[in-house]
Amino acid sequence: MFGVRSATVRFGHTLALDDVTVEVPGGSVVAVVGGDGAGKSTLLRALAGEVPLDGGTIEAPPKQRLGYLPALAGSWAALTVKQNIDFVAGIYGLAGEELTARRAELLDRASLTPAAGRLAARLSGGMRRKLGFIMAIVHRPALLILDEPSTGVDPVSRIDLWRLVSEAAASGTAVLMSTTYLDEAERAAQLVVLDSGRILVQGSYDQVLAGFAGVVTQTDEPVRAEWAWRQGRVQHEYWPGAGPPPGITVVAPDLEDIVIALSLVRRNEVLS
């Protein structure tokens, strides 16, 4: 079991993580969601050993057994896809027939075999993210940390990336990933919702839905603008305590509604 316990991280006067505990079991995917500045990247970087804790503990494998794909993962632009993979694989001692087989397997899984000889500089954004994923997992890590692996990529590449994530977990790897796509988060075994460095809720998708209190309504004109947000062409409004006035349509909240509503509760608590 990998993860962080009571993790606290400060950047100057800013509390980036505030007493955060997250467990990442082997063979499962834990998805971290939240708005900008929620602490998602800080949590992942802390577990990857890139950011020191000011308090709490980390349980992580040695560097040789850890795979990490940062939000701005870089490949070597002047190297081909194959050369990028081989360079990273060599750091972990993969060579010869073992490397050849592993490279071919991952290129096929990522639909990158036709691009194996292409310079990384000439790849699309989605192809670069898939290459970064391969470089993070080529050595079969025990813990795989992915910072928004599918942000900004095309729909087909998103499908490829999620398949790769699922296959990694199925092989026994513990996967911790942040994502801006809540449909991806819903597929994870566990969700962690962060806001301003604090956990608002965590658990399985079903547990998060079942534990959500209050009512969400749909309206063209919200009664209280500070509790409302746009959802497509309409607005949703959260009623954490007393129910809405008569005549307002109540809707079943989805994960996006829950994340926004909990964030609004947190921010109104801070302001009060």
Stretches found by the model and what they are:
Residues 33-35:
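The feature captures the beta-strand-to-loop junction immediately N-terminal to the Walker
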Residues 144-148:
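Catalytic Walker B motif of ABC-type/P-loop ATPase nucleotide-binding domains
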Residues 160-239:
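ABC transporter nucleotide-binding domain
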